[in-house]
Amino acid sequence: MRAVFGEKGDFESWIELVKLVSGNFPGLDLKCYKDVLIEKIEKKETLVVKEGEKVVGALAFSYEEKELSFLAVHPEYRQENIGTELVKKFASLFEVGTKLSVITYRDGDIKGKGARKLYKKAGFSEGDLITVFDYPCQEFIYIVK
């Protein structure tokens, strides 16, 4: 399975994945998320990994902000390097030397254990401790090689 740009036809399957993992995203407003997702698909700021027509991995990002804003892998497909494939594809869209960022959970938060491991494996380094939606988080940084 490989990461490709998301398309309008992936919308419903993507939303099903979001509903499945929504507990891991504090402050997620599904109505607002749907509106933003449509816009991101149109701007080619989404990547998916699919099994048939089913979205099993999804990544949203911003070219302008140089930020990975959403990453999820279907629970039944974890440990298959789907997250790694998505992150590698994301980084490949930017020029060498570009500073990319992602916000994830802080060290010690069980919700962020898998994400932090993935980002570190992909070459991200720990950045500032921040608070998002009244939840303690941490920024991770990656310099495109």
Spans of features found by a protein language model:
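A short beta-loop-alpha structural element at the N-terminal edge
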Residues: 1-16
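Active-site rim helix/loop that mediates acceptor-substrate recognition in acyltransferases
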Residues: 25-46
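Conserved beta-strand in the GNAT
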Residues: 48, 54-62, 67-72
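Residue-level recognition of the GNAT/N-acetyltransferase active site
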Residues: 74, 78, 105
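Conserved acetyl-CoA pyrophosphate-binding loop and the N-cap/start of the following alpha-helix
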Residues: 77, 81-90
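Conserved active-site alpha-helix within GNAT-family acetyltransferase domains
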Residues: 84, 107-128
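Conserved GNAT acetyl-CoA-binding A-motif
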Residues: 94-108
